[in-house]
Amino acid sequence: MPAATTHVEMAKEVYALSAYLQSHITDKQMFYLGSQGPDLLFFNRASILPGSTKKYGNLMHVAKVKEVIHYFEDYSKNDPLLRSYFLGYLCHYCLDSIAHPLIYGVAHALHTEGGPSEGEIHVTLESAIDLHILKKKGRNASSYNVYEDLRQDPKNVAKLAKMYRNMFHAIFDISLTQKHLERAIKDVAFFTKVLKPQQTKYKIFYAIENTCLKGSHAITGMMLQGEKNYCVLNTEHTAYT
């Protein structure tokens, strides 16, 4: 993927394209949340704690993608709120389809050259893209506030969780509780705020990673702080496999 900020900023640019499109997006907050696609499930319980919905987000990225899109399209057709979410969801896959091949290629190449795990490099690359996007908007890391665009009214959370619960049952034959999915949706705004750049917080998380996560720095890699020297923008047009 790219990460949360890049997906939301793309959604904002899509929204600005035409009045016709805006007439079909009646709730911008739901549209922006939709732009997170299945990544919505990655934030639950910080991704690494027991019971996280991360594995279901991974599943949605690799299995029955078309079926899920068709399910959400049909489910949301008479509900303007969920339709706004669905249109944002489409934006997610548009951006992923462009960015994923490059991110995976660069991550694999850097790992092969002796870098950390591909997963750690992947999220660090994504945060580098986020930082680049903010700079293009005349902003910097300290202005990071994507969590404000991802907050939801409790009624909206309940409605979206119900759609996901029904989808998992219908498409994957997986039973998830309404409560679990509502918590996962709320965790998106909560944990993207936890990732807000701050030097002391960065150092604390970095030390925790060294102590408890065997030196894997995937969490701090998601923060728009620290060294971001990976050439993910590929301005030299290097070929990756």
Question: What name fits each language-model region?
Answer:
Residues 1-87, 93-241:
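N-terminal leader/auxiliary helical segments
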